[in-house]
Amino acid sequence: MMMAPVPADAQNFFERLFGGGIKERRERDVRPEPAKPKKRVKRVKISAPSYYAYRPDKLEKVSFSDLIEAPRPASFEPSLDGGLFDEAIGGLEDFDLRAYQDVAAALTAHYGDKRAFIWVSGFSPNGRAAEAVRVLGAAADFGLEPADYAVTVPAPGFSMDQMAARNAELIRFEMALSAKVLRYVRDAWSGRVDPNRLSGYHDFPKKPLDLKKVLDRLAHTRDVRAYLESRHPQNERFAVLRVELEALRASAENDIVVDPKLLLRPGKSSPELPKMLALFARETDEAFRTEHAALLESSKDSELYDEQLVPLVKAAQAFKGLRADGIIGPRTVAAFAGESRAARIAKVEYALERLRWHPSDLGSPHVFINQPAFTATYVEGNRDTLSMRVVVGKKSNQTSFFYDEIEQIDYNPYWGVPQSIIVNEMLPKLYRDPAYLDRAGYEVTDARGRRISSSAINWGQYGGKVPFNVRQRPGSSNALGELKILFPNKHAIYMHDTPSKNLFERDTRAFSHGCVRLADPRGMAAAVLDKPVDYVAAKIGAGHSSEKITRKIPVYVAYFTAWPDQDGKVDYHADVYDRDSRVQKALDAIAAVRQPAG
C-alpha cells in the first residue's frame, strides 16, 4: 500500500513545530556522492643528519723561500742571537718540513718578523728547547700521541770545522721544533679532531687561535712548560679525567671478569652468579655490605639465583642507579664488573678530546646534559647542585652535540611540530584522515599566520615540505607538558616536561625525537631562574606565559661515555649512538696523515 505524499503546508507545519528536525535528519541520512579522488604526490621523507667519512687536513711542505731570499736587515743594533739566525738561514734550502697550512703560515710570519732563534743559543739547543721537548714527550699525560710531536734534537758535540753543517742542523731543528710545538698547541686548544667533520649532529664553533702570537709569546716566556700546558682545558673535570687516565694506565686488568652478555633470572643457575655477588660486596658501600652481610656470606658460592637473593640484587641495582627489576643482565654486569681496562682508557681519551671542543672554562652556573648517561645536571661552583634523569633522542632521531645559552622558559607551552615530524609521521595519517589534526588538538596556520582547518587542506598534494605550521595547544596531553626551557639553536632542541613519565624508569632512555625530556622540569626551571619551586608552580598555574633568563647560563648538550662526578669518581656509559667509534676512525685517519707508514 502506497502512502500519500505529505502536503507542503503540513510539512511546513512540522518544520515549524520541530525546528526543522525532520529535514535535518533526512539531510544527515543522505550520503553525498564520494568526491573524485585527487592525485597524491609521492611523499619524500625528511632525512636525519648523517655521519661522514672523516677527511683530515693534509700536511703541506713549508716554503722558506721568502725567509731565505729576504735581505739581511741593515742595523747597528745587535740582534738577540748576534746574527746567527741570518747566517744559518741558508740551511733551510731544500729542507722538507711538512706542516698544516696554518702552522706553516705562522712559521713564516713569525720568523719573517723576528729573524731570531727561539730554541737555540750559541751553537746548541737551549734550556727553553729542552723544556719544550719534555712537554711534547709527555703528551700522553693529556691523552695525546707523543709521536705526533717528536723532534730529533741535535747532539751537543760538533766540529768547529763543520760550522756550515752545524748551522744548517740548528736552523732546521728550530723550524721543526716550532712546527711541532704549534701542532701541540693546536691540538691542546681545540682537539685533533674537527667535530663538525664527524657528522651533521656535531655543531661546534671554531675556537680562534693565533699561532703566530703563540710563537711570539714562546720567544719571551720564562716558563715554556706552564704556557704550553695552559693551552689545555683549564676546568676541574678535565683535571679529574687526566688523573683517571694515569690511574688506569698504572692499574691491572679487572680481576673479576663476568660474561658481558649474562642474562640471569630468578630461579635459574649460572657460574657467573658468585662473581656478581662478590662484586655486589666490593662495588657498594659499607652500609650496603652491613645490611646484606649475612646473605652475601651464605650465598657467596651459590650458582642458583633463588628468591631470597632477589631483594639483594634489586638493592644492588638501585645502588648503581639502575632499574631495580631483579634481572642480572648486561647493564647490571657493566655497572659492577665494568669494562676492560683498555676500553676505559679509550673512553677517557675520547672524553679529553671532546672537552677540547668546548670552552676551557665551562662557566658557573651551567647545565650539563650527558646523553650516554641520560642525565641533566645544574652545576654551580663546580658542585652538582641538581641532577635528574632525562630522555634523549632515539637512535633514528639522535640528539645533537653542541652548546648554547639558555634564554627563556615557556610555561604551559605550545608545541611547534617540526617539519620532519609533520612529513615523516603526520602526513600518512592526514592522507587517510584530513581532520586528524583538528580532532587531536592541533592548530594549523599558513605562512601569514592565518588559522586553517586541517580538514580544509588537500594534504595529498604535499609530499615533502609542507607550507603550513602545526602546533599543539597547551594542555594535559601536550607533548611538552608544563614547561620548556629554550636555548634557540638550529637543531630545534630544548629541555621540556613530558606526560610520558614512565620512560624515566628505564635504564636506557633514548625515546624522544631529539629534544631532552626532564624528569624534574620544575626543579630545573627553578634552578635556572634562581627561584623556589613554588614560584615555578605558580607560573604554571597562571596559564600560558614566557619568562626571559636574565643571567648567563651555558647549556652543554654533550656526549661523554666517561665523565666524572663532583667528587672525582669517573662513571662509564654505553656508547648509545656509536659515536666513540666515529672519533676513533677520525683519529686513525689523522694518524695516517701525520705518521704515514714507511
Regions found by a protein language model. Name each.
Residues M1-M2:
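Bacterial N-terminal signal peptides
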